[in-house]
């Protein structure tokens, strides 16, 4: 068991970000900037997921854990449904991985349900998949393999 845990630990490299669902992205960016001094380091629209998002940096270390603000492009998007059901707040925690294919294969072998059959494009050229909340104590867990240049 210890060797299995050690091999899994080597696949996970950091807490990548905490995702927060918001109704108004511009308003949330301003609040996090004014309140905590967080700076936007990346912003994009992901039409496939129906979301407009911004990554905010904490401190000077670009590789440190970031805050991801997520606003829906339409009410029926995953973030739109989350806001309708739960209101604004923490929507996910994301772990940075070195090899998302190896991680998903290992998790599936252990009986963990993932939302996608194969990793999909994520923020800033990353590849992502999600562990189903039923398998993670009610938490939506995102797995993020950063883009090669990150």
Residue ranges and their predicted role:
Residues 38-84, 124-148:
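Conserved short beta-strand elements that form part of the metal-binding/catalytic scaffold
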Residues 13, 31, 44, 81-83, ...:
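N-terminal hydrophobic or amphipathic segments with adjacent small-residue motifs
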Residues 4, 24, 37, 69, ...:
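Acidic/proline-rich low-complexity IDRs
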Residues 2-11, 15-23, 54-59, 73-74, 79-150, ...:
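Vicinal oxygen chelate
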Residues 8-49:
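Long, hydrophobic N-terminal alpha-helical segment
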């Amino acid at each position: 068991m210890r060797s299995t845990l050690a091999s899994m630990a080597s696949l996970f490299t950091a807490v990548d970000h905490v995702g927060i669902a918001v109704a108004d992205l511009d308003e949330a960016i301003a609040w996090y900037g004014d309140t905590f001094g967080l700076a936007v380091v990346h912003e994009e629209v992901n039409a496939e997921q129906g979301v407009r998002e911004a990554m905010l940096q904490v401190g000077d270390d670009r590789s440190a854990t970031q805050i991801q603000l997520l606003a829906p492009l339409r009410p029926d998007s995953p973030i739109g449904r989350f806001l309708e059901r739960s209101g604004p707040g923490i929507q996910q925690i994301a772990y940075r991985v070195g090899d998302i294919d190896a991680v998903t294969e290992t998790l599936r072998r252990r009986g963990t349900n993932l939302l996608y059959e194969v990793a999909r494009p994520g923020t800033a050229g990353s590849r992502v998949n999600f562990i189903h909340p039923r398998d993670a104590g009610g938490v939506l867990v995102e797995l993020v393999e950063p883009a090669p240049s990150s």
